[in-house]
Structure formats: C-alpha cells, structure tokens
C-alpha cells in the first residue's frame, strides 16, 4: 500500500496539486478529475508514474488510465492524500461541465443517456448472436440451420430470441428511464412514458408503412382533431424529446405544488400533458425527422458505400478521443429500428477497436521498456474485447504512428465491408466477439474485414518501427 500511496501523491502533483482538483472520482479503469486549470498538468511527469497507463482529456474531464482492480485502491489513497473527500460521478460531471463548450455539453448529454443502458443493449446483441448461430442456414450444414436439423432446439432458440429482443422491443422504456433521470425528473415516470409509446394497443411502428399505403391507420378523434394511434418501437428521437418535456414539467410542478398533494397532482398531470404532446406533436414530428435522417444516411451509404466506409471506419478512433463516438449509438439504434433492420455503422466500430488492439500488440515486440511491453499486451487484448482506451491512450497515441496505421487499416476494412453491404442486427461487444452481432449472411465479408485489421495494423506498425529504427 506504500507504493500506491506514493503513486497517488505523484499523480496529484502531476495534475497540478490538490488545489487544482475541483472534484475526483473513478470508474472501472480510470481516475476522473475535474481540474480547475488543465494547463497545469505535467504530462511528462504523469507518464513516468508506474501505475499510470495513459491519460487524456475529454468532455471537460482529465482522465488517468490506471487499470481494473488497482484504480479503486489508488483513488482511496488519493482521497487520503488530498483530503478532497470522495466525489460521485455526477458531482465530477457537474464540475467538469464548466470546462465544456455547447457542442461538448450536447455530446455529453447523449453519452449520459445512452451509456447507462449499454449493458442491456450489448447483452441483447450477444444473445441475438447466439440465436443467429442456431437459426441461420449454411453455417454448420450446407442448406439448413441447427434448429432445422435438430428440431428439439427450436423452442430454446425461440426463448433466446424473446429474451434478446426484449431490450429492443422496449427500447423507448430504457431510454425514457435514463433520459428523464439525466434531465432531473423521476426515472420511473420515464419508464412509464417509454412503455406508453410502445403500448400494444398502438399500431406497431414497423407496420406503419403498409398501413399508410392501405389507408388503415387507426386514429383517435379528439373533438374533431384526428390523432394517429401509432407506436414508436425502435425509435430514439420521440422518447428523447418527450423525456425532456416530462422532466421539465415534473420539476416545474413539484416546486409549485404543496408537498401534501404532490402525489395526487404532479405525476398525473405530468404524464397527461406529456402523453398528449407525445402523440399529437412530438411523436409525429420526430418520427418524420428520424425517417428523413435514416433514409438520407442509408441513401448516402448506398450510393457511396466505399467512401463512407473509408471515412467512418478510418476516423472512428478519432471520435473516441473526442468522446463524440457516443452520439453514434443513437444513430445505430435508429437504423436498427428502421426498415433496414440493421446498422452498417456498428460493424466498423468493431473493426476499428480490433485495429487499435493489433497496433498495440505490435508495440510489445518493439518497445524495450518492460512496463510498456506489459501494457501493450494487456491493452491489445482488451481492445480485442471491445475496451480500447488503454490501447489508444496508453500505447498508440503515445507513439503516434501505431494509432495512425490502425486508423488507415480500419478505414480500408471499413471500405471493404461497406462495399459488401455488411449489417449488424444489433450492437454488441465492439471487438472480436462482435461477429456474433453481424447478420449471418455477412459473416464471410466481416471475417475478411477482421483479417485486414488483425494483420495490417500489426505488420504495418512493426515494419514502420523497424524501418524508422534503421
């Protein structure tokens, strides 16, 4: 524990001293600081500390990569050393917002909404992958699936499919819970709002197109005003805007309603007003906007698939550095909920992560420092499993050329899989296990993309380092 105390003291000194720390907390792998002045950080000193695997600044926070299992111990020593008191993640986020511009605040808001629901979505993606293995034809048998050859497996596959599909079927409820909580309202009302938007009495959003063509869209007649009885399954924008409205109405009413009757007044009025607004105004408008955006994106990638894959696949790692990659989860979910039924963006995310891992692994055979060798190995494996921060910030950005070579490689792989029309039926673990989220008919093309990002970044990084050394 003496070494950890020493490391904590060194970290405090490197980030500008205790007086420069407005708040501090930690996540699974990183210390998160809200610093008063980031220009006071001594980067060179920080990089020399044994427990530090990397550092970066994003969304108004200065984050120091320590590693799972060690970070909580270092944080405990840091609290003792500085006397700042333990801060919650929310407190650090609030303190860090002072350092953000409007765009960063918007990106952070989306990240705060979608990151908490990621475990449910990723789990659903993995289970859908298992269902794909059981039901897809031509994987283990030339023209049949496992359930066709072994019918006794059919009900098991059906149960897995039901469990996997639940998160996407009730996606507005998940988003409603997280969004209302983020906007300062009661998250339970957010769940009710989300479930309301996918109520079984409503026309399923996926059947809207056919119903519109046949002229059979059911409506409510509110004193002459016809309101379509349409659900918003798989939609992101309606629940986001409705959640914001719900939270603001609830906060407004709570401040102005006597405490004794809040239970009878606040929630009923809040849900009624938000519900009417959702079905009459918010839902139809955002549904149309969402369709225009997804149709436009699909059209662009349909016409310029290779170019789109090259750019998105190549620059995704750069988005990770800025923190803007979180915004694309909403786009992925919107694409999955569209007529396309899948996302062409998420497969490139998985390949980008693998590329950064391959470049980091190559550095293990290049660097002389034993600490960096160990970090290159562990961070490379971590990136293969979908966690790229140690590889990007601890290894690749430190030497620059591995990061650039990985970007070029993932751009090439993205160009290839986009030209092949590869789609993921869900989002999952963004690394090697990501293949299970890919629609089975595209496994071959995705495997070639994986081969590119496994081989090219490793070989390119190794060759460049040797050539540069000579």
From Swiss-Prot:
GO terms for cellular component: plasma membrane. It catalyses: alpha,alpha-trehalose(out) + N(pros)-phospho-L-histidyl-[protein] = alpha,alpha-trehalose 6-phosphate(in) + L-histidyl-[protein]. Residues 1-88 form the PTS EIIB type-1 domain. One of its GO terms (biological process) is phosphoenolpyruvate-dependent sugar phosphotransferase system. It is an enzyme of class 2 (transferase). Induction: Induced by trehalose-6-phosphate. Repressed by TreR. Its EC number is 2.7.1.201. The keyword Cell membrane applies. PROSITE patterns: PTS_EIIB_TYPE_1 (PS51098), PTS_EIIB_TYPE_1_CYS (PS01035), PTS_EIIC_TYPE_1 (PS51103). Residues 108-470 form the PTS EIIC type-1 domain. The phosphoenolpyruvate-dependent sugar phosphotransferase system (sugar PTS), a major carbohydrate active transport system, catalyzes the phosphorylation of incoming sugar substrates concomitantly with their translocation across the cell membrane. This system is involved in trehalose transport. B.subtilis does not possess a trehalose-specific phosphotransferase enzyme IIA component, however it seems that it use the glucose-specific phosphotransferase enzyme IIA component to delivers trehalose-6-phosphate into the cell. This is PTS system trehalose-specific EIIBC component. It comes from Bacillus subtilis (strain 168). The lineage of its organism: Bacteria, Bacillati, Bacillota, Bacilli, Bacillales. The gene is treP.
């Amino acid at each position: 524990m003496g070494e950890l105390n020493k490391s904590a003291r060194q970290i405090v000194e490197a980030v500008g001293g205790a007086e420069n720390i407005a708040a501090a907390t930690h996540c699974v792998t990183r210390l998160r600081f809200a610093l008063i002045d980031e220009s006071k950080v001594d980067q060179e000193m920080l990089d020399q500390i044994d427990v530090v695997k990397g550092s970066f600044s994003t969304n108004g926070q200065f984050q120091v990569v320590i590693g799972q299992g060690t970070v909580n111990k270092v944080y405990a020593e840091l609290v003792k050393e500085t006397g700042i008191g333990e801060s919650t993640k929310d407190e650090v986020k609030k303190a860090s917002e002072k350092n953000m511009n409007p765009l960063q605040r918007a990106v952070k808001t989306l990240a705060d909404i979608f990151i908490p629901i990621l475990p449910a979505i990723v789990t659903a993606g993995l289970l859908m992958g298992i269902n794909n293995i059981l039901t897809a034809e031509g994987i283990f048998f030339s023209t049949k699936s496992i359930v066709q050859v072994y019918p006794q497996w059919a009900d098991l596959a059906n149960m897995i499919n039901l469990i996997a599909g639940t998160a996407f079927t009730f996606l507005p409820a998940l988003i409603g819970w997280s969004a209302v909580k983020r906007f300062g309202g009661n998250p339970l009302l957010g769940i009710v709002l989300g479930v309301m938007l996918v109520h079984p009495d409503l026309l399923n959003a996926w059947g809207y197109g056919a119903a519109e063509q046949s002229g059979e869209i059911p409506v409510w007649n509110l004193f002459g005003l016809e309101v379509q009885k349409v659900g918003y399954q798989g939609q992101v924008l309606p629940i986001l805007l409705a959640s914001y409205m719900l939270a603001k109405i609830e906060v407004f009413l709570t401040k102005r309603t006597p405490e004794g009757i809040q239970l009878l007044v606040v929630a009923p009025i809040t849900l009624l007003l938000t519900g009417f607004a959702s079905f009459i105004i918010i839902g139809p408008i955002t549904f149309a906007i969402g369709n225009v955006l997804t149709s436009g994106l699909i059209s662009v990638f349909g016409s310029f698939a290779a170019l789109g894959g090259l750019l998105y696949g190549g620059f995704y790692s750069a988005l990770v550095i800025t923190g803007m990659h979180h915004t694309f989860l909403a786009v992925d979910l919107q694409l999955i909920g569209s007529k396309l039924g899948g996302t062409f963006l998420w497969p490139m995310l998985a390949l980008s992560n693998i590329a950064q891992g391959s470049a980091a692994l190559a550095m293990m055979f290049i660097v002389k420092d034993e600490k960096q060798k160990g970090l290159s190995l562990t961070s490379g494996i971590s990136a293969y499993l979908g966690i790229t921060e140690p590889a990007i910030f601890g290894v690749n950005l430190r030497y620059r050329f591995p990061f650039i070579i990985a970007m070029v490689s993932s751009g090439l792989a993205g160009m290839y899989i986009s030209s092949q029309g590869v789609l993921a039926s869900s989002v999952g673990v963004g690394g090697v296990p990501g293949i299970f989220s890919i629609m089975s008919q595209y496994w071959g093309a995705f495997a070639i993309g994986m081969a590119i990002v496994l081989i090219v970044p490793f070989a390119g990084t190794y060759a460049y380092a040797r050539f540069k050394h000579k």
